[in-house]
Swiss-Prot record:
Signal peptide stretch: 1-18
The protein's role, per its UniProt record: Primary component of whey, it binds retinol and is probably involved in the transport of that molecule.
Gene3D superfamilies assigned: 2.40.128.20
Protein name as annotated: Beta-lactoglobulin
Keywords carried by this UniProt record: Disulfide bond, Milk protein, Retinol-binding, Secreted, Signal, Transport
Classification via Pfam families: Lipocalin
Encoding gene (name): LGB
A single Gene Ontology CC term: extracellular region
Coiled-coil parts of chain: none
Length: 180
């Protein structure tokens, strides 16, 4: 019992914490998220996930496509080996409409936090596997313009999460994101 209390005390003192996203959208209609999107802002729990152009989770979402099975196909672009590479990720549906399983980019979940379907979509990619727990979130918009309302909602959603780096893009950068 003493060892258990000591271990618990050390864990709390050392700041060991799980990254948990508690806010996901209720009643997501996957068909309404279909179409073209632009990555307006990104944030991550670990600076190394976004700090360089070729960082592991610095990806630019281009399009979301619901599949007939209820999964979500994510088309994105990412810098690899000094050039822009097109990627396709299949996010598998779960029992929770706004949560999807993935096996890509070293992540294992995609969580939709919020969307109005017409202007913005906020989502996070989570890796809950020990010891490399990580979280990266993005604010997507339908047009290559800065949407202040979407950014405010993104910042509000991030307040409850352990984010250490945040990037935002202006309209010129949105148009010039990693294009193949």
């Amino acid at each position: 019992m003493k060892c258990l209390l000591l271990a618990l005390g050390l864990a709390l003192a050392c700041g060991i914490q799980a990254i948990i996203v508690t806010q996901t959208m209720k009643g997501l209609d996957i068909q309404k998220v279909a179409g073209t999107w632009y990555s307006l802002a990104m944030a991550a729990s670990d600076i190394s996930l976004l700090d360089a152009q070729s960082a592991p989770l610095r990806v630019y979402v281009e399009e979301l496509k619901p599949t007939p099975e209820g999964n979500l196909e994510i088309l994105l672009q990412k810098w690899e080996n000094g050039e822009c590479a097109q990627k396709k990720i299949i996010a598998e549906k779960t029992k929770i409409p706004a949560v999807f399983k993935i096996d890509a980019l070293n992540e294992n979940k995609v969580l939709v936090l919020d969307t109005d379907y017409k202007k913005y979509l906020l989502f996070c990619m989570e890796n809950s596997a020990e010891p490399e727990q990580s979280l990266a979130c993005q604010c997507l918009v339908r047009t290559p313009e800065v949407d202040k309302e979407a950014l405010e909602k993104f910042d509000k959603a991030l307040k409850a999460l352990p984010m250490h780096i945040r990037l935002a893009f202006n309209p010129t950068q949105l148009e010039g994101q990693c294009h193949v």
